């Protein structure tokens, strides 16, 4: 299973791209902002797309009662996620190496993929919970208050994935480079599984 082991190792190593590239991106465009405001979500913190984007977003949020964008120290996820990604990358490389040496079955490759998928789903759920709290837990004394037709306060929760019109802002939430590379890496581990299965049949 040499070929399958190598593919598994490459796929696992692509997770390390998350230490350099953002996982996710949220952009806010409006007529008064010719250059959209944006924030890149990394596994260890949130950064502005441009130098002053986070400051400007926090300024807008203040008027409608939203909290400031959290610092890494404010969220436990930003200290745990790097450890999870590093651990899963190391585990994947180890499984790939053992597969290369024919010490483990190709089924370990799909086992790693399933575990990574579960962790990914949990991560997206946690991210969505944060977006909900971020957009809904508003200061009752905010300068600007917007309500729904039924009289309840309007939520400013950004979409988890895709586009949403929010007041006069066009909000887009999509994976960034690190997210796409992680997807490619996970896809390669599925390829490794089928290649390993094929190689085993030829023995």
Where in the sequence are the language-model features?
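Alpha-helical transmembrane segments and their helix-start/interface "positive-inside/aromatic belt" motifs
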Residues: 1-15, 103-116, 195
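Membrane-interfacial loop-to-transmembrane-helix junctions in polytopic alpha-helical membrane proteins
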Residues: 3, 74-80, 101-108, 167-177
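Hydrophobic alpha-helical transmembrane segments
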Residues: 9-11, 18, 77-98, 110-121, ...
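Transmembrane helix-loop junctions and nearby membrane-interface residues
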Residues: 19-26, 93, 97-100, 124-134, ...
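Long, glycine/tryptophan/cysteine-rich extracytoplasmic
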Residues: 20-79, 128-173
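Mature, soluble, non-transmembrane domains
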Residues: 100, 104-141, 162-164
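A hydrophobic membrane-anchoring alpha-helix module
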Residues: 172-199
């Amino acid at each position: 299973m040499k070929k399958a082991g190598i593919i598994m190792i490459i796929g696992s190593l692509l997770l390390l791209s998350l230490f350099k590239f953002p996982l996710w991106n949220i952009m806010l465009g409006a007529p008064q902002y010719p250059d959209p405001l944006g924030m890149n979500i990394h596994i260890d913190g949130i950064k502005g797309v441009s130098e002053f984007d986070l400051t400007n977003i926090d300024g807008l949020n203040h008027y409608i009662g939203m909290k400031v964008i959290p610092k890494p120290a404010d969220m436990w996820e930003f200290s745990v996620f790097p450890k999870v990604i590093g651990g899963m990358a190391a585990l994947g490389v180890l499984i790939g190496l053992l597969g290369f040496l024919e010490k483990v079955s190709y089924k370990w490759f799909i086992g790693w993929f399933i575990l990574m998928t579960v962790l990914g789903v949990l991560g997206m759920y946690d991210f969505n919970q944060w977006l909900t709290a971020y957009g809904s837990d508003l200061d009752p004394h905010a300068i600007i208050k917007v309500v729904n037709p039924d009289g309840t306060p309007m939520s400013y929760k950004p979409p988890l994935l895709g586009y949403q019109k929010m007041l006069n802002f066009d909000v887009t939430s999509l994976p960034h480079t690190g997210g796409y590379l992680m997807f490619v890496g996970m896809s390669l581990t599925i390829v490794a599984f089928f290649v390993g299965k094929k190689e085993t049949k030829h023995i």
